[in-house]
């Protein structure tokens, strides 16, 4: 019984951490980067509460940079 409780507690803590981490990624600003590639990406715009398309240059980005609209919406719950 004690072991089951401990496993449940660890799982809950892990999911909470992942949710908090994803939430902080979604609050990061859009970063185009200094490079000159042309990648169509999506970021979560915290002001509008929506995932929006932008052009990523290919380097020095951050976590708020998703290859698909679906991925952006799944992580940021938009």
From Swiss-Prot:
The signal peptide, as residue positions, is: 1-22
Looking at the UniProt record, the site noted as Reactive bond for trypsin sits at: 36-37
Alphabetically, the GO molecular function entries are: ion channel inhibitor activity; serine-type endopeptidase inhibitor activity; toxin activity
List the GO biological process terms. Answer: venom-mediated suppression of sensory perception of pain in another organism
Q: Name the site position(s) for Has role in the stabilization of the complex by binding to different residues of TRPV1 subunit D.
A: 73
Please indicate which residues carry the site annotation Important for modulatory effect on TRPV1. Answer: 70
Domain of life where this protein originates: Eukaryota
Tell whether Disulfide bond is among the UniProt keywords: yes
Name the InterPro entries on file: Kunitz_BPTI, Kunitz_BPTI_sf, Prtase_inh_Kunz-CS, TFPI/VKTCI-like
Query: Hey, where's the site called May bind to TRPV1 subunit B on this chain?
Result: 23, 28, 60
Residue ranges the record marks as coiled coil: none
Cysteine pairs bridged by disulfides in the record: 26-76, 35-59, 51-72
Question: Where found?
Answer: Secreted; Nematocyst
Site residues, May bind to TRPV1 subunit D: 53
Which keywords has UniProt assigned to this entry? Disulfide bond, Ion channel impairing toxin, Nematocyst, Neurotoxin, Protease inhibitor, Secreted, Serine protease inhibitor, Signal, Toxin
Q: Name one GO cellular component term.
A: extracellular region
Specify the BPTI/Kunitz inhibitor domain's residue ranges: 26-76
Which protein family is named in the record? Answer: Belongs to the venom Kunitz-type family. Sea anemone type 2 potassium channel toxin subfamily.
Q: Quote additional remarks.
A: A synonymy between H.magnifica and R.crispa is controversial.
What is the recorded function of this protein according to its Swiss-Prot or TrEMBL entry? This protease inhibitor shows two different activities, it inhibits both the capsaicin receptor TRPV1 and serine proteases. It partially (max 50%) and reversibly inhibits capsaicin-induced response of TRPV1 (IC(50)=54 nM), a receptor of the pain pathway. The second activity is a weak inhibition of trypsin and chymotrypsin activity (Ki=1 uM and Ki=5 uM, respectively). In vivo, it shows antinociceptive and analgesic activities. It significantly prolongs tail-flick latency and reduces capsaicin-induced acute pain.
* Name used for this protein in its record: TauPI-stichotoxin-Hcr2b
Origin species, per record, is Radianthus crispa (Leathery sea anemone)
């Amino acid at each position: 019984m004690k072991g089951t409780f401990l496993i449940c507690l660890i799982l809950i803590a892990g999911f909470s951490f992942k949710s908090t981490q994803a939430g902080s990624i979604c609050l990061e600003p859009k970063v185009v980067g200094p490079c000159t590639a042309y990648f169509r990406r999506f970021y979560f715009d915290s002001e509008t509460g929506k995932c929006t398309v932008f052009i990523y240059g290919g380097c020095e980005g951050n976590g708020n940079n998703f290859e698909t609209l679906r991925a952006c919406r799944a992580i940021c719950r938009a």
